[in-house]
Amino acid sequence: MTSTKFIQNKTALITLIAACLVVLISLGVRQTFGLFFSDFKNDLDISLTESGLAVGLQMLMWGLSGPIFGAIADKYGGHKAIMLAFVFYILGIYFLYSGPNTGIFFQIDMGLLVGIGLGGTAISIPMSIVGKHFPLSNRTIAMSLVTAVGSFGYFISPMYTSYSLINNGWIHTLYIFTIFLAVSYTHLRAHETSID
């Protein structure tokens, strides 16, 4: 049995790093929304029912948009699908703190836009892109790394968010999330010729 190098070329390395960054930030940010409830209730007059509806709509849109982003990835490349999804995700978070964000707009921002963004930035599209760049012998390890980094995002993001909410407030925290998402988008944009 011959052993193969884990990372075959520079493209595989860039793809793995980009996918890990995308999953870390997108799943990490998504995991923190429950921590904002008291601030949404006090400042935006969002009830528990409205917040639950937004999260439910978010999950629905995540599921519905996933196959659409998969089709976009097949036709135009995975990087384009993820970049488009990041546009929706960034807009959703941006409008939550600076745009119209009460009533139906809360559902549009947190439910519709963020949910659509998750359809292309969560685990499925980044994992499929990584799978293309690694040989069968190393593919499961590479994809496991992406999953592990996503789990780390689940772990670290709520801790950071709790700290930031106490010290900076919810608006500033969402602003920082927008920056994180924009950094991921910029990283993808800079390496879009390498990632497919």
Language model segments and positions:
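Extracytoplasmic
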Residues: T15, L21-S38, I46-L48
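C-terminal ends and interior cores of transmembrane alpha-helices
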Residues: F88-N101
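Residue-level signature of mid-helix packing/kink "hotspots" within the transmembrane helices
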Residues: M59-P67, F155
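Conserved small/polar residues in nucleotide/adenosyl-binding loops
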Residues: T186-T193
